[in-house]
C-alpha cells in the first residue's frame, strides 16, 4: 500500500517547468534585493535610505503596469517570458559592478523591477491555461508559496554567501549577484522547454497598439470596480505586499537595535522560522479552509497580523531585564513562524478567489492591475512608516501599525469579510 500519494499537480510537466522557472527567477531577484538592502544598511544605518530602494522596486509597477497586462493578453506569453528572463540576467550581473552607489543601485532596481512587471502577470495568467480547475488551488498554493518562499530563501542565502566570500565591505558583496545571474540562466533553459501556450485572446478595437492597450486596461478597471469578488482579493493581496514592504525596510534596524544581532544573522534567526511558517501554512491550508471557511480564516489571519505588529512593538520593553534580550529573540522567532502561516492563509486564498472569479481573457490584465495598485498604495505608507521609525520611535511604529490594523479589521470585518468572500465560483 502506498503511504505517500504524489499530488496530481506534481505530475503536470508543463506546470513543473513554469514553477521551476519561477523558483530560479524569484530567488535570484530577491537574492539581489536583499544583498542591496544589506549593503545600504551597512553603509547608512538608515531605514529611510532603504525605503528609497524599496520605492524604486515598486514604482515601475505603476508606470509599466498600465501596458503590461494588455500586452501579456495579446502576445505569446512564452516568448515574452524568455525576453524578460534574458534582460533580468543582464541587470543582475550589472549589480556586481555597481559598488555602493545609491543612485546606480536604484537605477538597476528600477530597471529590473520594470522588466519583472511583464513576467509576473504572464506567469499568473498562464497557470489556469496549463492546469485543470480541479487542481488549480494546488497550483496556486505551490506557486504563491514559491513566490513568498523565494523572498525568504533569497534572504536566507544572501548573508552566508557574502560572509563566505569575505563579508560586507569586501568583494564578497558581488557573489550573490553573480549567483543570481546563474539562476536566471537555469530558469531560461527550463522555460525554453515549455510547450506553446494556447491563450484566449481578448477582442480589441482596430487601431494602434496604444489604443488597443488602453482599451483593454480600462476594460479591466471596469471589471475590478464592478465585481467585489475581484476587488476584495486584490485588497487582501495589496495588504500582504504592503506589510512585506514595511518589514523589509524597518526590521533590519529592529534586529540590530533590540535583538542585538549582526545584520547577517537575521537570515538564520528570523527567516528560517518564517519559511517554516510558510511551509506549515501550505500544509495546513486545506484543513483550515474546511474548519473555518474562506471568510473566517482570512478575517482571523488579518487580525493576527495586527496582533503580531503590536507584540513586536511591545517586546523591546523586555530589554530592561537580564533575560530580556533572550526573551525578545524567542518571541521574535515565534512571531516570524506565525507570520508565515498567516501570510499563506491570506495570500493563497486571495489569489485563488481572484483567479476563479475573473474572466480568463483578463487574467494577465487583472494581475497587472494588482501590480499597479500595489505601486500606488505601498510606496508612500512604506516611506512614511520608515521615516517615523527612523526619526521618532521604531517600537512605537509597530504598536501604531498593530492598533491600526486591528481597528480596521474589527470595524470593517462584517462589511467586507461577511458579504463578499465566499467559496470561489467556477
What residue spans do the PLM features occupy?
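Core transmembrane helices of Major Facilitator Superfamily
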Residues: 29, 111-123, 338-350
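C-terminal transmembrane bundle of multi-pass solute transporters/carriers
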Residues: 53-56, 60-67, 74, 78-90, ...
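Cytoplasmic helix-loop-helix junction between adjacent transmembrane helices
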Residues: 109-149
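Helix-loop-helix hairpin linking two adjacent transmembrane segments in secondary transporters
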Residues: 143, 147-192
Amino acid at each position: 500500500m502506498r503511504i505517500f500519494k504524489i499530488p496530481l499537480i506534481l505530475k503536470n510537466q508543463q506546470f513543473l517547468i513554469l514553477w521551476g522557472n519561477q523558483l530560479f527567477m524569484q530567488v535570484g531577484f530577491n537574492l539581489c534585493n536583499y544583498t542591496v538592502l544589506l549593503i545600504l544598511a551597512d553603509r547608512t544605518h538608515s531605514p529611510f535610505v532603504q525605503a528609497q530602494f524599496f520605492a524604486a522596486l515598486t514604482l515601475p509597477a505603476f508606470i509599466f503596469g498600465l501596458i503590461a497586462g494588455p500586452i501579456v493578453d495579446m502576445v505569446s506569453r512564452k516568448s515574452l517570458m524568455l525576453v524578460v528572463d534574458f534582460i533580468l540576467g543582464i541587470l543582475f550581473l550589472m549589480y556586481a559592478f555597481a559598488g555602493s552607489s545609491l543612485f546606480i543601485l536604484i537605477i538597476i532596481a528600477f530597471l529590473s523591477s520594470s522588466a519583472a512587471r511583464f513576467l509576473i502577470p504572464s506567469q499568473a495568467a498562464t497557470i489556469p491555461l496549463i492546469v485543470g480547475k480541479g487542481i488549480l488551488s494546488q497550483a496556486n498554493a505551490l506557486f504563491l508559496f514559491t513566490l513568498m518562499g523565494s523572498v525568504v530563501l533569497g534572504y536566507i542565502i544572501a548573508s552566508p554567501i557574502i560572509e563566505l566570500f569575505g563579508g560586507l565591505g569586501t568583494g564578497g558583496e558581488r557573489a550573490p549577484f553573480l549567483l543570481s545571474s546563474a539562476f536566471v540562466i537555469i530558469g531560461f533553459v527550463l522555460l525554453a522547454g515549455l510547450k506553446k501556450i494556447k491563450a484566449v485572446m481578448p477582442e480589441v478595437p482596430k487601431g494602434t497598439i496604444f489604443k488597443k492597450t488602453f482599451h483593454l486596461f480600462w476594460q479591466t478597471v471596469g471589471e475590478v470596480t464592478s465585481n467585489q469578488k475581484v476587488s476584495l482579493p486584490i485588497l487582501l493581496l495589496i495588504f500582504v505586499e504592503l506589510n512585506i514592504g514595511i518589514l523589509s525596510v524597518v526590521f533590519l534596524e529592529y534586529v540590530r537595535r533590540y535583538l542585538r544581532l549582526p545584520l547577517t544573522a537575521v537570515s538564520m534567526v528570523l527567516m528560517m522560522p518564517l519559511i517554516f511558517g510558510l511551509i506549515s501554512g501550505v500544509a495546513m491550508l486545506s484543513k483550515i479552509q474546511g474548519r473555518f471557511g474562506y471568510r473566517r480564516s482570512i478575517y482571523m489571519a488579518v487580525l493576527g497580523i495586527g496582533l503580531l505588529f503590536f507584540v513586536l512593538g511591545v517586546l523591546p520593553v523586555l530589554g530592561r531585564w537580564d533575560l530580556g534580550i533572550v526573551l525578545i529573540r524567542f518571541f521574535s522567532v515565534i512571531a516570524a513562524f506565525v507570520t508565515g502561516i498567516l501570510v499563506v492563509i491570506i495570500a493563497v486564498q486571495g489569489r485563488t478567489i481572484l483567479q476563479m472569479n475573473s474572466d480568463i481573457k483578463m487574467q494577465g490584465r487583472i494581475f497587472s492591475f494588482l501590480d499597479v495598485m500595489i505601486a500606488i498604495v505601498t510606496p508612500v505608507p512604506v516611506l512614511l512608516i520608515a521615516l517615523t521609525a527612523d526619526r521618532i520611535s521604531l517600537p512605537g511604529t509597530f504598536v501604531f501599525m498593530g492598533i491600526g490594523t486591528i481597528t480596521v479589521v474589527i470595524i470593517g470585518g462584517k462589511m467586507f469579510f461577511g458579504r463578499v468572500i465566499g467559496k470561489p465560483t467556477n
